Amino acid sequence: MEPSPEMKRKRRTKDKRVLRKALQCICFKKRIVVLFMEWNKTYHRRKICIIFFSVVLMSMVLCGRLVYLMLFEGKYYETQAKDLQQRERKIKAARGKILDRNGVVLADNKSVCTISVIHNQIKEPEAVIAMLVKELGIPEEKIRRRVEKYSSLEKIKSNVDKETGNRILAYGYAGVKVDEDYKRNYPYDTLASKVLGFTGGDNQGIIGLESVYDKYLEGTDGLILTTTDARGVEVDNIGEERKEPVAGNNLRTSLDANIQMFAMQAANKAYIQKEADSVSIIVMNPSDGAVMAMVDYPEFHLNEPFQLIEEYKEYEGTKKEQEYCNRMWRNQCINDTYEPGSTFKVITAAAALEEGVVSLEDRFHCPGYIVVEDRRIRCHKTTGHGAESFVEGIENSCNPVFINVGLRIGADHFYDYFEQFGLLHKTGIDLPGEASTIMHKREKIGLVELATISFGQSFQITPIQLATTVSSIINGGNRVTPHVGMQVENGDKKVIKTFDFPVQEGICREETSEKMRFLLEKVVSEGGGNKAYIEGYEIGGKTATSQTLPRSAHKYISSFLGFAPADDPKVLVLVIIRNPSGIYYGGTIAAPVAKEIFENILPYLELEQ
């Protein structure tokens, strides 16, 4: 059926409306495209401008940086570049000498070589390996590993003697370096080994004076600078630059090489004759604490410090080797404590005189023992000394007399004297590893403990502590600091530094000091220390025999402490013999050792009879 005219009209109107909308849409899209194209042109222009100005700015910054580096940092980067082309080798500085008080050299240096290789410079590796094996006696495998190792400088061996170093140098092999070096040398080898100490592979002090005064003894290493190409090969036509080493300063000590030898000979003799475990001897000036000799026998070999002494040879190559090296290096004069026994009666007597609880005329009775609380404490003379004065009690080293004196002082006051005399603190000696006093706490000291303390048992001190405290009592009452270092000198003997050691005045009265010198002279001239007596000399002293712990082991320590001249002491000697065989009484075996030392050193020191 054909549509009516009205329907046709409506359809045409609708089609026109659709067409109009389509045209409007097309026009809108066209407009958008036109706008986008206009915006795109603006965007690209802006982008180009930003990129352009960024490039210009970056160029200006880079140019400015280059100008800055060239003008202001040029030398720095030139040095950096040069460093990349330079190889440095150290020139070891000579270590300072250690001298005795008279300038005798106790430690110096031996000129040696260090052999190294530079892998990329070696042209004949097999010949180099064969030569190094032959000259150095090192297994081929070890040499080969180091020669073939890619490194700038590989050390083969240090401390090579000069003759061997010169022979290696004479081969003329490229890549083999022979550098000058120093090895510590001890002219007397075992003399004062535990005092001097030794150095390690880096030439730094390990123990003893070498360790304590290392900062003065060590020098400043020098350098050898060589120029290399891109492959690390040294350029032949450019000479080496050298920065010369600066040697260390010398240390002058209070030791006297001759007195040290006298003491060491006496210790060696006692060690052999008495089949002892060890012998320690200290010789010092009681007026200022200067140590003139210190022996702890057996000593070790300073030039071969890791070689065990004969007594420890069985431990070589075992797991205990290092343990016995440490034992061998240990200085029992300062590192170990012991019960001083009757030598401590010097301190008990001084405390009693200071406290005013005893006089030289006081009378005592010794039946051979004394009962304190539930303990029966015997005298070394089991039959007893009978009636005796305080002076005779010291001469006889009578335990009951000193127990009575200790009880008079009282635990509290006795502890105060430990503090006053400096016994509860380290002496401050300039040697490493000083041990502390082992003592009861004040509140733990009962009557039995007080009784045993009064004659030198139930507590422990070091030998240097005993020597220092007695020195302070007999020198007028000044607590000195024992020391070995005296001053630092340069190679021209100019003094750079003098060491001052503290002195505490007034630890006891001059009157007490005078009485103690009188009492101790009587011990040697008339009492138990008579085996140290030397005709023509006034010598004061005190003997001791003490047991080690545990008591059940029945091991003893025999000792004697003496000084001369008795009225004005200039030298003090302490002798300690550990676990002697046979007779072990201090007056019998330690006093004669001290006498032998006095017989040698009193004339040597020109002390008048």
Predicted regions and their residues:
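Beta-lactam-recognizing serine transpeptidase/beta-lactamase-like catalytic domain environment
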Residues: E2-K8, K29-L35, A107, D229-E240, ...
